Amino acid sequence: MFEINPVKNRIQDLSERSAVLRGYLDYDAKKERLEEVNAELEQPDVWNEPERAQALGKERSSLEAIVDTIDQLTQGLEDVAGLLELAVEEDDEDTFNDTTVELDALENKLGQLEFRRMFSGQYDSADCYLDIQAGSGGTEAQDWASMLVRMYLRWAEAKGFKTEIIEESDGDVAGTKSATIKIIGDYAFGWLRTETGVHRLVRKSPFDSGGRRHTSFSSAFVYPEVEDDIDIEINPADLRIDVYRASGAGGQHVNRTESAVRITHMPTGIVTQCQNDRSQHKNKDQAMKQLKAKLYEFEMQKKNAEKQAMEDNKSDIGWGSQIRSYVLDDSRIKDLRTGVETRNTQAVLDGDLDKFIEASLKAGL
């Protein structure tokens, strides 16, 4: 006879965790939105606006990743509970063993979805760019930079992300002086944002005829793709609208009616005014157009300031900002921030980075 209580407890635990996640991720709203997006994408004229169609396609993928996974968890847990009942009724150990295998798979799926809660930053869901820059040290450092490029490309491929090499400058003899890679996929920036920093390599250099040990540095800098399309929505509650008598030229009625309009956008302090028409309605429309234009420029300046802050942060990465050490002679790679290390150096250089990335995200770096 097999022990069923531990399995029942696991089913209960996974059901409770799944219910918490369902609420946290706002499953009902996302499911409703997914239906709306699917309906829009089924419209025959959707590709008349390619950019909007692409944005909808991306939104659908993001929504499906959550909705479909929660649906699979819900159905999977029901199926496992039924399988357990069958195993008990028929006293079938093989069927019982199947329940534990299924539970392991469901727990893994749930764990991956729970991990998404780490991605709460403003740009975590965005595509991103990864800059790799060789440090001083000539060919050895440039070869190390090319190894990092390969490592991140392999990691992205394993994650199912698409990649584009935006720019790559070859090294003098071998390797890469610098490269920029665009990584496209859900939460690309969220996954990679803690990889910014200096990567240190220690090995016997293949470029040294004496086979001596060399230390090389290359930096990685990760930054999100910030969309330039800014949708200006104005909340009427944020506006103070004053009307007053126009002054100056404007005809015989200019000072007889309060046709001039001044609009103040209280959250930003932006003010627009118009008095060039005798109609208060037309003056108000014109002032609103000006306000939208000013708010658009205001938002653009904010975006540019954010981009500049990212660039400033990039220049702050000094060679002392080491995040990971790769000592190939000793078969040891260690993250200097979290203490996570491994001796399977080749696997890491082939893109097996998740243990380091997950630890840094959980540490809130």
Swiss-Prot record:
This is Peptide chain release factor 2. Keywords: Cytoplasm, Methylation, Protein biosynthesis. GO terms for cellular component: cytoplasm. The gene is prfB. Coiled coil: none annotated. Methylated by PrmC. Methylation increases the termination efficiency of RF2. The modification N5-methylglutamine is found at residue 252. It is found in: Cytoplasm. Pfam families: PCRF, RF-1. It comes from Pectobacterium carotovorum subsp. carotovorum (strain PC1). Belongs to the prokaryotic/mitochondrial release factor family.
